[in-house]
């Protein structure tokens, strides 16, 4: 899918190039769960998944951004793209060797921005342009590279972001959730890049929220641990 996205970009069909990357992100969110359900996980599959992620969320977005925005920056533009691709590679490598010994409450958070989200974030200037947003007042030579670099380093940071892996949905709200999903995808089909732009804005706003939430839960668990140790000392 990543190579297909690059092909679309070469043909200057940037709408399809972005849609291909978003489609790859959706598949990436489902393939692991499906593999676990059918008990089809393997080390080879894990490595192949990382390889395809590297192309879809590393090489393809970097190529699109260089082709559209950074080619005029010369060597600096190429360096920006190299930094981003390296950050994606480091993130995927870290994910592959990540230990499963972390406390269960940490499963609700990623360390840093995941590579699918990072790919969509770095494409934000193009997505905003396709949604009809007026980008004329923006100084591309400063704002876009700065945003690109920040996103790159968020990929390899330890900044906690929501993983949405273990969301508990009350049964009584299931019908409303299904309605919301249908409505979202219906609007996505009609106002594709406007809805994607809004989704990006919501995700960016959730980054500091997830950090504060993480710190709150971490402090709570630390206090509980101290309390348990005090109770144990009292017993002894």
Q: Where are each of the predicted segments found?
A:
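Transmembrane helix-loop junctions in multipass membrane proteins, especially transporters and channels
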Residues: 10-11, 37-41, 69-72, 96-100, ...
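Membrane-embedded alpha-helical segments that form the functional core of polytopic membrane enzymes
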Residues: 1-47, 78-88
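Helix-coil boundary and interhelical linker segments in multi-pass alpha-helical membrane proteins
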Residues: 4-19, 55, 59-81, 124-143, ...
């Amino acid at each position: 899918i990543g190579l297909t996205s690059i092909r679309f970009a070469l043909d200057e069909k940037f709408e399809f190039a972005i849609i291909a990357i978003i489609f790859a992100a959706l598949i990436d969110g489902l393939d692991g769960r499906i593999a676990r359900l059918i008990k089809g996980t393997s080390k080879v599959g894990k490595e192949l998944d990382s390889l395809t992620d590297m192309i879809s969320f590393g090489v393809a977005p970097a190529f699109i951004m260089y082709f559209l925005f950074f080619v005029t920056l010369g060597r600096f533009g190429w360096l920006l793209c190299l930094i981003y691709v390296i950050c994606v590679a480091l993130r995927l490598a870290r994910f592959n060797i990540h230990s499963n010994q972390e406390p269960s409450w940490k499963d609700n958070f990623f360390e840093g921005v995941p590579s699918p989200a990072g790919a969509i974030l770095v494409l934000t200037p193009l997505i905003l342009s396709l949604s009809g947003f007026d980008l004329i007042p923006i100084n591309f030579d400063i704002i876009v590279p700065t945003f690109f670099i920040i996103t790159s380093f968020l990929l390899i940071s330890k900044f906690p972001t929501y993983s949405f892996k273990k969301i508990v949905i009350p049964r009584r709200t299931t019908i409303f959730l299904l309605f919301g999903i249908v409505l979202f995808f219906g609007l996505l089909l009609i106002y594709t890049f406007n809805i994607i732009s809004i989704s990006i804005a919501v995700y960016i706003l959730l980054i500091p929220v997830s950090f504060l939430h993480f710190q709150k839960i971490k402090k709570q668990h630390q206090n509980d641990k101290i309390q348990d140790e005090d109770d144990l000392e009292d017993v002894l």
